Amino acid sequence: FRLNTLAIIFFLILSCSKDIPTQDNLTLDIEFNELGSDGPYLYGETYYGRKSYITYYPGNIPVILSIPHGGDISPSEISNRTYGVSVTDSNTIELGIAIRNYFYSNYNVRPYLIINNLKRTKLDANRDKVEAAQGNLFAERAFDEFHFYINSARQEIINNNSTGFLFDIH
């Protein structure tokens, strides 16, 4: 009896010590559209990343406005970041749109505008990807979209003008 009891206790301890999978260490079988599959990007149109976490307005002058920290979307599929700065830059989306509209009203041109609509607690698009998304697959996708749109605008500016300006609005 004593030997059986010890064997059962040993088995229970051994079986309970196994790692229980969590969302962070599970491999999720999720496929995203290829970056750029929503292009080519045309002036006057608006483009959205997955679930509208990122918004891209192509421009027609060699100026890019980047808004990495102004969003207010807080989806449950993206866990809160646990380290790094998480304070939202207030009114930066409104400022970027106002600047873009000012250029149009006064000069009939518009800069490129890329907006991160996620709260900074979910994604900090101005950090390296590890700190920015902290391992969340959906935050990483939004990060990739944000930077893809910036690089698309940058490449178009280089192709058409050879040089331009990028203003990162905070």
Language-model regions, residue ranges each:
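Sec-dependent signal peptide recognition
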Residues: F1-I9
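Intrinsically disordered, low-complexity serine/threonine-rich segments
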Residues: N4, K18-I20
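C-terminal motif of bacterial Sec signal peptides marking the signal peptidase cleavage site
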Residues: L12-S15
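N-terminal catalytic or cofactor-binding beta/alpha core of small enzyme domains
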Residues: I20-H170
